[in-house]
Amino acid sequence: MNSLRSVKRLLGARSLSSDGLSESVNSSDREDSLSFQTPSTPSEDEMPQCFEDLIKPQVLSSEASKSLLSLNEGIKMEIVSSLQQKDQKKRNKLIAWMRKKPCYEQPDDFISYIVNTKIDSIDESIIHKLALLLRNEQVIWVEKFIHNGGFGVVFCTIDKISRLEWREELHDSILEQLLLCVKAMCTVQRGLECLSQSTYNVERLISLLLSKKQPCDFVVREVLVQIVHSFYKAHLDKEEGAMQVFSLFSIKDDKDEEVEFLKNVRVDRPFRRWIIELEDVSRNVFWVWNHDSNVIDLEKQYNQVYEAPLGFIGGIETEATSYVAAHIHLINELLEGLPLEKRQRKRLELQLSGLERIMGLRFRKSSQKFHKKLHEALREWIVAAKIDDWPYKLVQTGST
């Protein structure tokens, strides 16, 4: 009997793993193939062939195969019948689970699910489906989701996840999908209006981006920057929007607690925390900045849409430089929205914080062939600086 159990365990584990859940994941389209049929026990004439078919897929030595084939016919029939019953039970459970799983289609369904589900129990696939619907559905569907409170619910959940002391991989995955939901909602006017009135929420996102709890993936961090960019674009008064974003990125020190002589010698670097984030990226992918002789061509338009060679598709280098480019594009647009006097003041503050140094001594050295998006952002900065008579040679050539 012990040998019989061993054979069942061996064949059952291997055969069921090969055709278990993987063949029946496609919900209602596959229910017909997983019908509740009573397992039919093979006849004595069919038994040898049926048992051989069961043995063939297994990775067994020739001696083990011969030993199994030499078993008594009664034992063979019992093994096959037992495995068929186990397989049918597994299929029945799967179909029952598929029928019980709720179908989320309407905006209120998703809002109710997010509100009534604990963070640890949220299904990432449902939030992913919501992000896809917000991006691809009609405008009226997205506006209904926002009108019914979806915008606030999504931001509230993001805030809860960002406040967790220890975030797991599941939390980061859900956070990414929720951020994509916010990004998708910003494609409609109603979403931009809500975002422009959500200064506190945007401040929380920036704090998350520049904190030690920031998402690990550069792609997720880039989505955060894009949401901040949308927050700026949502302002009708570009000067007011630019100053507000700059204030959110600046360091808020309590200067009243400083000693008087320290105030006199202290150099104000309001965006130092922002630039440190870019410096950390340059250290994490240090091997990218190895083209010392690069010079940014002001006349050349770097085509950002190109076919990258194999090995540079979706690599960490591409993600890192794309993330850095998103920051520089944001800075360029913020500066463009300010009058000349305020723009020069912000340029000086960014320079003292270390932006120009890292652009000229690090980002300029990335490959012009493989990281065109970053070089286009640098070119835009240099062209704007040249128009304003601001020194730009350090960024263009790496030397003054």
UniProtKB/Swiss-Prot annotation:
Membrane-spanning segments: none
Molecular-function annotations in GO: actin binding; small GTPase binding
One term under GO cellular component: cytosol
Broad class of where this protein is predominantly found: cytoplasm
GO annotation, biological process: actin cytoskeleton organization
Compartment list: Cytoplasm
Claim: Cytoplasm is one of the keywords in the record: yes
Alphabetically ordered keywords of this record: Cytoplasm
Domain called GBD/FH3: residue spans: 39-400
Pfam families in alphabetical order: Drf_GBD
Highest taxon listed in the record's lineage: Eukaryota
Cytoplasm among keywords: yes
Disordered: region residues: 16-47
Protein name: GTPase-binding protein rid1
Organism: Schizosaccharomyces pombe (strain 972 / ATCC 24843)
